[in-house]
A protein has these predicted regions:
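Acidic-basic catalytic patches of nuclease active cores, encompassing PD-(D/E)XK
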Residues: 10, 42-75
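Beta-strand/loop nucleic-acid-binding surfaces
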Residues: 1-10
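Non-catalytic C-terminal interaction segments of nucleic acid-processing enzymes
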Residues: 138-140, 144-146, 151-209, 214
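OB-fold/S1-family single-stranded nucleic acid-binding modules
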Residues: 28-46, 190-192
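Conserved catalytic cores of phosphodiester-cleaving nucleases, focusing on short active-site segments
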Residues: 86-116, 129
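Aromatic/basic micro-patches that form nucleic-acid/chromatin recognition or nuclease catalytic surfaces
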Residues: 173-176, 205, 248-333
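Flexible glycine-rich surface loops and low-complexity tracts that mediate binding to linear polymers
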Residues: 15-27, 181
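GIY-YIG nuclease catalytic motif and its immediate N-terminal context
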Residues: 195-262, 281-288, 327-348
Length: 348
């Protein structure tokens, strides 16, 4: 099935999840027979089709039901301005107003976040909307959150730090709104349309280039690796998750870990060189989460490598083994959501 959504969707597209598909009609030009519209999570469908999210916004605007835009009128969709194109050109208080709509499917508990994958296009939209606003044509962005329980929205500074800092930089130039919607089993739009809170102070505190991180490494075959002071270690075939932290320059630390060519310093450098692939999952935070991450991973892992990455702390290890890819494991995804999103509820 064709999936018109550029996100990672790790927490949604897990094995066994129910997908809502529509058959592509003859002559549609699509070589794939189906298009994915939604996926079920916790008994409710979550809209995946990003183009349909714009149709939802258009319908709410026409009915005067989009919070913050009740009196506005759509002049046209896909409005061009210079080198940019925006989802809507509105008539707002007698003036033109550019509006971008972003579809948000990442949430846990009360908090929703966007984006779930790096979006250079989204960052560019924010920057150019702010330029137009400073030149006299106001604009804004609406994050359409497909969650029935979320009451708070934050940019996903774990996944796209640059987008998140850009949103903070332009928030005083633009109208920034987050709106919650929900869907029925027949994919009809539910009656509740909610204005979500955006806690700018908390975002400013947490969206910093510091915190913890997880590295997911694949070993396609068993092999013995010389790990510095630990000596030779037999790594069995499978996946390994390493928990680390950086009090400053987290982005550069993660980029260094992802590179193969470097001067080896930490235990993880030796394993990264031997691994077939490596995926980084930052967990930006104003508090030290490294040891809590390691403890939680230890409860999920199928084995561990003693003393790995733990020479300067009381933890038994910071490296944990899994037979299958943990990013496809609902329990690992729940752990990631808990540290990235749900723990922030305590600060609301």
């Amino acid at each position: 099935a064709y999936l018109p959504n550029p996100g990672r969707l790790w927490e949604l597209l897990l094995p066994g999840r129910l997908l809502y598909l529509v058959k592509n009609p003859p002559g549609s030009g699509k070589s794939i027979p189906y298009t994915a519209l939604a996926v079920e999570r916790e008994g409710r469908p979550i809209l995946l089709h990003t183009h349909l999210a714009n149709d939802v916004a258009a319908s709410l605007l026409a009915a005067g039901r989009l919070p913050g835009f009740e009196q506005d009128r759509v002049i046209r969709r896909e409005a061009a301005a210079g080198s940019s194109r925006y989802d809507f050109l509105l008539a707002r208080g007698g003036r033109d107003f550019f509006l971008e709509v972003k579809s948000c499917t990442l949430f846990d508990g009360r908090i929703a976040m966007f984006p779930d994958a790096v979006t250079q296009r989204g960052r560019k939209h924010l920057e150019q909307l702010a330029v137009h606003a400073r030149q006299g044509t106001p604009g804004g962005v609406v994050f359409l959150v497909h969650s029935p329980q979320a009451d708070t929205f934050m940019p996903d500074f774990h996944t796209d730090f640059t987008f998140s800092r850009t949103l903070l930089d332009v928030k005083d130039d633009l109208l920034v709104k987050a709106v919650g919607v929900e869907w029925g089993e027949d994919l009809s739009l539910g009656p509740r349309i909610r204005n979500l809170d955006i806690p700018w102070g908390l975002i400013e505190r947490e969206a910093r280039d510091e915190g913890g991180y997880l590295l997911v490494l694949e070993m396609a075959r068993s092999r013995r690796v010389d790990v510095g002071g630990l000596g030779g270690i037999a790594f069995r075939k499978g996946y390994y998750v390493y928990a680390g932290s950086a009090r400053t320059a987290l982005t550069k630390r993660v980029e260094r870990h992802l590179r193969r060519r470097k001067r080896f310093h930490w235990h993880i450098d030796f394993l990264r060189d031997a691994a077939d692939s490596c995926t980084a999952l930052p967990v930006r935070a104003s508090e030290d989460l490294e040891h809590d991450l390691a403890e939680s991973l230890g409860k999920l892992a199928e084995w561990s490598i003693p003393r790995f990455g733990a020479s300067d702390c009381r933890c038994a290890t910071h490296l944990f083994g899994f037979n299958t890819n943990p990013t496809r494991d609902p329990e690992f995804i729940e752990l990631l959501l808990r540290f990235r999103i749900r723990r922030l509820e305590a600060f609301l």
